[in-house]
Amino acid sequence: MTLDQISRIQALVAEIADLSQTFEGPSERFMVDGLPFLRKSEELVTLVQSPAEHATSLIIKTMETAVIRTLLSLNVLQTIPTTGSITLQSLAVATETQESLLERLLRVVTKTGFIIRENGGYSHSHTSLAYAGPLGALFAPCYDEGIRALVRLPEYLSVKDKEEAKNARYSLFTWNEGQEGKATFEILSTMPARTEGIHTLAMNVQHLRPYTGFFDYSKLVSEDRERPVFVDVGGGNGHVIKEILQAFPQIRPEQCVLEDRAETLELARTTGLLPAGVQLLEHDYLTRQPVSNAKAYHLRAVAYNLGDAELVQLLKQIVPVMGADSKVLIAENILFDDNSTVFSTVSDMIMLGIGGKERTEQNFREVLYEAGLTIEGIHRAPGLEYGIMEASLATS
């Protein structure tokens, strides 16, 4: 170890000692970057750890990740009592799992301290107890829709072109599921538990993807009361339109259009989210946009589901029907060039698996330029990577 490294270690130890004086506890919010005390502690571990120790730690952590997901699916974490302990035999009987298999799985998580083993019994740590509750319901879909396929990425790239998926129907996800040629939503529609997990995850990261508070939708209001003001392309069950109409009552429901697949629109009708007057229009966003001269075409959580080629294709379906003052509003994470957040980093790897992509400002500029659009403004939510790219027709 060099003198510079030793000096840095000593400086970090001093910083951590100072931070400990004001440390009030860790953050309990999911998918947020750690507080300075934790970040500095992790930096210290990285600095003092040898490459061999790093590799060993990584192997154990990878195995622990798979084991924790398995214990959740076997209902093991949910069966360990919240207080006290349970024997291996009782745990095996309660979960209908072979005792020797359980013993081997639990050996991994007792080694890491995730589960506590004392006097022949197994009990929760404060961390595993959280996984037995709501946290487990957030961890599971991240594993199922991200890690599960990503562990096969080296194999996938060895038999495919070494590039991003050009088409979401031929992605790491569809390949891993053995269903290439099908859309992601088609595959997931046969897996209700995993679909429910995705919805649960989406709801719990909503604070990182706010609907309003950073873009002035009132400027879209048109003097022409017959002109469509807000077309929500791939808008799901209507949450976005509902939130915008509540925050900007000067926009009339009759001037809003919700576009999506037929089954999604049927859900929008049954939930009762949308105020009367909003138009519902069945539409495949990779085909020609049916609403002409709208003031704004809005895409939230759509662009990141698509690779560059498919996003350009989508945008090119909108450009021919835009008016001179029409806008395209893309609501997504806009990644920082350096030091992206935990949330966007994880999200990008999940999107990589399904043929989508989180993008930097430059990535967006390139895609928009190819589609015949230019950026007019970038509107970030305060303190977040999330924001709206406001684009208009490019001038020749």
Swiss-Prot record:
Please state the biotechnological applications recorded for this protein: Griseofulvin is a spirocyclic fungal natural product used in treatment of fungal dermatophytes.
Q: Name one GO biological process term.
A: terpenoid biosynthetic process
* Leading EC class: transferase
Per its UniProt entry, which superkingdom is the organism in? Eukaryota
Enzyme Commission designation? 2.1.1.-
Knockout phenotype, as recorded, reads:
Impairs the production of griseofulvin, but accumulates the intermediates griseophenone D, griseoxanthone C and griseophenone H.
| Entry annotated with the keyword Oxidoreductase | no
GO MF, one term, reads: O-methyltransferase activity
| Name under which the protein is recorded | O-methyltransferase gsfC
Q: Which gene encodes it?
A: gsfC
